[in-house]
Amino acid sequence: MKERTFKKMIFAVFCCQFLSIPLFAQQQKVDTTHTYSIPEITVSDIYQTREVRSTAPLQVFSKDALKNLHALQVSDAVKHFAGVTVKDYGGIGGLKTVSIRSLGAQHTAVGYDGITLTDCQTGQIDIGRFSLDNVDRLSLNNGQSDNIFQPARFFASAGILNIQTLTPQFTKDKKTNIAGAFKTGSWGLVNPSLLLEQQFNKTWRMSVNGEWMSSDGHYPYTLRYGSAEGDLSSREKRKNTDVQTFRAEAGLYGNFSDKEQWRLKAYYFQSSRGLPKATTFYNDHSTQHLWDKNTFIQSQYKKEFSQQWVFQTSAKWNWSYQRYLDPDTKNSLKKTENSYYQQEYYLSASVLYRLLSNLSFSLSTDGSINTMNADLNNFVQPTRYSWLTAFAGKYVNDWLTISASALATIINEDVKKGGSAGNHRKLTPYVSAAFKPFHNEEFRVRFFYKDIFRLASFNDLYYEEVGNTQLKPEKAKQYNIGLTYSKNVCPFLPYLSATVDAYYNKVTDKIIAYPTKNLAVWSMKNLGQVDIKGIDITGSLSLQPWEKIRINLSGNYTYQRALDVTPPRSKHV
């Protein structure tokens, strides 16, 4: 269900013109020079019309839609988006990343309550650690959102997955909400969760939620010892696939007025996961293990000074820890054990100016400091200083929507040991438009173009024997043209919508692992060009055979072709 919020300002003098007001002995005089405001009105709309009107492909799952998917994690729900590949490394407890239109997980940003998540070590975000129990809305943007009032980081990727968590809602007579859930399933899955929401007064609200998940992952499989008919086979169970995770979140919400809000969120996550090895004949021994911890605190403040000027700011501190253990390594210590630490300090500020009712501009600037350390010998201990500034504009009328932006990126890197990867300066543009050729039909033609890049991760740059500090940013150019249509057909078919988008992505200076001296010695290189072509089709309809019964149907189709078009001579350099 889609919700839209309207804030209306009315003059008392207008009420006097249209309302008949009885006269009493002591009639209260109305100050006609003062502007009176009515409380915020929330209007609910059954159908998703924003996706059809957007200038770039947008897909949304509301809270009700997520319930109908019967998904356990965010990664399960994201698989239902068109043009998306969820890469699953290691099954139940493994890393799960999202890639949009074959560009790779490093080109896809993940936002959590309006602030992006980061991992400078790998450049990839594990979306498998987010549950759907406290998610209010999932949205996926290709290219860029039509919302120009957002942090600069939201302009700095080829696409973004937005995770919006629940905001406490209360009835007039109820100030406390408590909800619990217990899920269980195959392979020893146990998943309890608890949610507590409290309203202190009209201004302050709080929410606390947590969950624990455990699974042994011992799923059965058949191991065949030959391909010919009659060859031996045996029934086995996967080993070292256990996983235990714990997540806790706390939020404080300050609603000072309809024009001023503040939000504070604290997040903690930890996991313990077995790392199963490849299945081989007569050897199922596997003991590798991985431990993860992550915590962050983020704050957001928004103030609407007038109908023309709006300001918002965000701040975040993030800390993460990872420990890897292989007790069967053949070395003098008889094990391999490494620990990695990351920290981030992030600050953002944005201002929106509405020049006209249908023309607005925004300016956003973000600054961040990312550090990494490890218990490895001679580890370089890199630090990345990032400064992003985005200037954007948007024009909207009944038949045309145009959005454009320019992102300036400044990156400085420093290390305590060895050589650093150097600094980067780049300006990247974006433009999109949607045109409605017929006045009485919700039919639109849309297109967008975006020039973007992604930096090499700390692992790509500094990992022992594999890292390469000479790596250049991996660049991507995106082209998209599409058609959208929606219609209220009849009482039996109250809603019908469809979108068709064709796209072309060109990736240059692709960062890949490449063998150097022999197949046992690899290094990271800018060696590759990729052409990506595809079509995304989505459709949804709503049937209402009876007054109190509604049937919603939706589906999507994706065709992708990604080709390595690197010149043959370059491959042997």
Across the structure, where does each feature detected by a protein language model lie?
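Short loop/turn motifs that connect adjacent beta-strands in outer-membrane beta-barrel proteins
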Residues: H34, Q150, P168-T176, K202-T203, ...
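N-terminal periplasmic "start-of-domain" segments of outer-membrane beta-barrel proteins
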Residues: P39-K67
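Extracytoplasmic beta-strand/coil segments of soluble accessory domains associated
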Residues: S75, K79-T116
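A beta-strand signature from Gram-negative outer-membrane beta-barrel systems
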Residues: L132-A179
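Flexible loop and strand-edge segments within Gram-negative outer membrane beta-barrel domains
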Residues: G217-Y219, A228, S234-R247, Y253-F311, ...
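Membrane-embedded beta-barrel scaffold of Gram-negative outer-membrane proteins
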Residues: Q308-Y324, F438, V445-F448, E474-K533, ...
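Structural signature of Gram-negative outer-membrane beta-barrels, strongest in the C-terminal barrel
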Residues: L356-N505
